[in-house]
């Protein structure tokens, strides 16, 4: 309740997610390869999205499989869009908010893990060399990205400002963390628009 009532309005906040959160739960055990087209179609129908949703999700990866598309749909419904909506709600009441997306593609699990849930954690804390991070990084990782993310998070902790444009509803400036990180206006807008008006718990 405190989140929706903006009891935290004065507190600066970083809000974001990885691009492909749900792949952590679908790639390592091979579930992503067992998803048939009807399963994705059923999930899409239950979500009640706009008629162009199949075309939007077909673009999430080159030659996207039903499993790829379902992973993207689940990433949006359970992680990305709730975070996005929270950032939107904070921006609407003037709460200091900075939005980010983690886009770096992990080569883990045969190059299929991608920008999955938890892949961003060793980058934020600059712990790429840890034994726990190795399976998710699929190798040594990309140290310049870790330096960049850790630097922004450290600055935020010290100053309350991570060092990129504050989020607003006019241009939706969002830091995209990747091998080349940059602030982008309203990235993945087509997927955000699919979920406009949907409620999240």
What are these regions (language model features)?
Residues 142-163:
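Non-catalytic, well-ordered alpha-helical segments in soluble enzyme domains
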Residues 159-187:
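Mature extracytoplasmic/periplasmic domains
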Residues 182-201:
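Tryptophan-rich aromatic "cage" segments
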Residues 1-140, 152:
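Substrate-gating cap/lid region and adjacent catalytic-acid/histidine neighborhood
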């Amino acid at each position: 309740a405190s989140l929706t009532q903006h009891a935290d309005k004065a507190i600066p906040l970083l809000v974001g997610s990885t691009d492909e959160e749900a792949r952590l739960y679908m790639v390592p055990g091979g579930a992503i390869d067992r998803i048939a087209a009807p399963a994705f179609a059923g999930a899409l129908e239950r979500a009640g999205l706009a008629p162009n949703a199949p075309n939007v999700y077909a673009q999430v990866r080159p030659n996207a499989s039903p499993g790829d598309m379902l992973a993207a749909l689940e990433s949006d419904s359970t992680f990305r869009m709730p975070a996005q909506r929270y950032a939107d709600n904070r921006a609407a009441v003037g709460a200091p908010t900075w939005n980010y997306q983690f886009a770096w593609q992990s080569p883990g699990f045969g190059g299929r893990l991608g920008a999955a849930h938890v892949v961003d954690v060793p980058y934020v804390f600059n712990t790429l060399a840890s034994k726990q991070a190795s399976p998710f990084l699929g190798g040594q990782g990309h140290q310049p990205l870790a330096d960049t993310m850790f630097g922004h998070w450290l600055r935020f902790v010290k100053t309350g400002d991570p060092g990129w444009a504050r989020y607003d509803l006019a241009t939706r400036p969002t830091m995209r963390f990747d091998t080349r990180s940059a602030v982008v206006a309203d990235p993945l807008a087509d997927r955000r628009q699919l979920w406009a008006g949907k409620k999240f718990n």
